[in-house]
Amino acid sequence: VTPGRHHVVAGVLVRGATVLLGHRSPDRRWCPDVWDLPGGHVEPGEDEPAALARELQEEVGVVPRDPVLLTRFEGDELVLSLWVVRAWDGEPRNRQPHEHDALRWVGAADLSGLRLAHPAYVEVVHRLVEFGNAAPPGE
């Protein structure tokens, strides 16, 4: 965890050629009324995989198996780490309707019509769909 910056993890749950997005409720303080990946803040003393597992369990009721770090965005106030999750225990469902008012499996073609929390999500989903369920080259 980087002092002075918000440290956030998000899970990119991949099912076929789609990823799971949650629509943030319009009354949320941060990033209201946009589509976002499930995840949240890393707590003090917690590593990213533990934070990811906790947040995915809290928000969508799944326990990730073998998540892989995809990318990390670092800004002055925020560190955002995206983890690819291709396997999990449980069936995704909205466990925090006060945070997300809807969940949806979204393909790359569907992204252009959605307001996204982070513009990089478009590239992330396109890359994942391009690789399909195969590991990136070199793995």
Please give the residue ranges for each predicted region:
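Conserved N-terminal beta-strand and adjoining loop/helix that marks the start
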Residues: 1-20
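Short, charged/polar surface micro-motifs in flexible loops or helix N-caps
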Residues: 14-19, 26-28, 43, 76-77, ...
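Conserved Nudix-box catalytic region and its N-terminal flanking loop in Nudix hydrolases
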Residues: 18-58
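A short coil-to-beta-strand element that immediately follows conserved catalytic motifs
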Residues: 62-72
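Charged phosphate-binding loop/patch that engages nucleotide di/tri-phosphates or the phosphate backbone
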Residues: 117-139
